[in-house]
Amino acid sequence: MAEFLSLHDAVERYVEDGATVAMEGFTHLIPFAAGHEVIRQKKRDLTLIRMTPDLVYDQLIGAGCAKKVIFSWGGNPGVGSLHRLRDAVEKGWPHQVEILEHSHAAMACAFEAGAAGLPLAVLRGYVGSELPSVNDQIKFIECPFTGERLAAVPSVRPDVSIVHAQKADRAGNVLVEGIVGVQKEAVLAARQSIVTVEEIVEDLRSEPGYHPNACIIPGWAISAIAVAEKGSLPSYAHGYYPRNNAFYKEWDAIARDRDTFTAWIEENVMNAGGNA
């Protein structure tokens, strides 16, 4: 059952060195505040999992938190490369990082399989792709019923999943509004989970606009809930604040240079305090 903690205490308790960590949120609700807390606590040797790593993983990688990244499409959306990811993979700074790249479809299926407690996900995919030649976690199997050749990938079962959402209620249930990625599946697939939210309300069912088909992550599936106002900036939170498009453009120059990046992290993450 969900426990209400500060973000500092939630990360300290559930994100251990060497853990496999998934931070999800597609386009919006990207858990930047939680990612920054992981950096502040100098967590190390993490295996990071995410569909579209985005700036948050560029920052974690450049800060030395990651040893491995499992992902689908790594880039700065609408801008270009993730330069800290590239520097780690190509030149080993701040240290070498192993990568396993999948398709979006495979990653989504892998999270869904993990949430169901299955060992693998099966899909139609990778036809004509060269990814299987560089990722030994992509296999092909024959359907026992039709004989069709299908792709198979391991399910995603993180040690801890971290997501951001708009609201949680006092019972620990979480409401995700707007574009829904694999946040729910990531939480259900994980051994432990942290959910950061913009606010806590008494009862989600009493909130204006609540409807039975809303995406709810149940409190029994969540380990810790932490309030992190504007916790997904510079991405956006539907109904709360817009995306900071200017920062995504600025990040390209910040991340290109090691010294500029290090100075930015020191000023904006290490010395910023965060959502305590």
Give the positions of each predicted feature.
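Conserved alpha/beta enzyme-core scaffold
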Residues: 1-276
